[in-house]
């Protein structure tokens, strides 16, 4: 991210603060922090806090041992680094930074959604008259719309995870434990260009009916349906895709169930276009599954936003009447889960464009037989 890019984001945050009559944004290490500064220090017991003021006087309070890293990354961005020693109270530096920026004790402050509770409680004790809200009311609307560089990063992440999906038949074979398949997937995800693996869900047979199953000791058997949900991070941006395979002959009725799911997922992707609500995309998938008699077995929302985080705004769920806009990126991932038997899910990342929806995953969604 260029210095101009970061400076532009800081200006947009300041404008959002002013619009919401909020004096400052306070962020610890988080996706919001990374979105603004282009790097993220470790979120440890030592306080790191970025103070972005609506007045334009920004500070970064950091432990002294991490100050060189902060200075290197900030460059000439104009953020003042306040390094604190082990014997100092960093909250006092935060309060001082707010005062220097003109924020009084009764300020309205937007605090990072993922800030450690211990830091927030200490800040509230130091500024009991301040009014507090969450950072997402400020940063959420800004991060929700991806710029072209972000979309390009998501596309690279999608291509990298697709390269792993193309090889699933190498690992999903009878006689292998789920956890061993997950370990191979972790290696393959990194080898495909991800700097880290975010998750490797391998749910075989009845375990596939648990959407967030943790890969365990169960051995994959002939006739199993196997749900594979994998993702990582490329250039800071996340990939996330799900495919369902069958080992040999599909279980009774599974091919018909899967075809319902495939039709529903395609309908959800086709429904994406500017002005359509998130709830409408959910309904496009859910109505087909419900009409086929599987409605009670579709037990989660249709999708979630994606970017610097695996799950972020917008959420594709009933009741979310927010209209889609070009630049929004999210998953479309309906699933059908029959407890004690098997599950199935298909997931693609979709970007809303001026003309409709662009899928960032291109691997086949046909029922794939392996083993």
Each language-model region and where it sits:
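Active-site neighborhoods and metal-handling regions in enzymes and metal-associated proteins
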Residues: 1-371
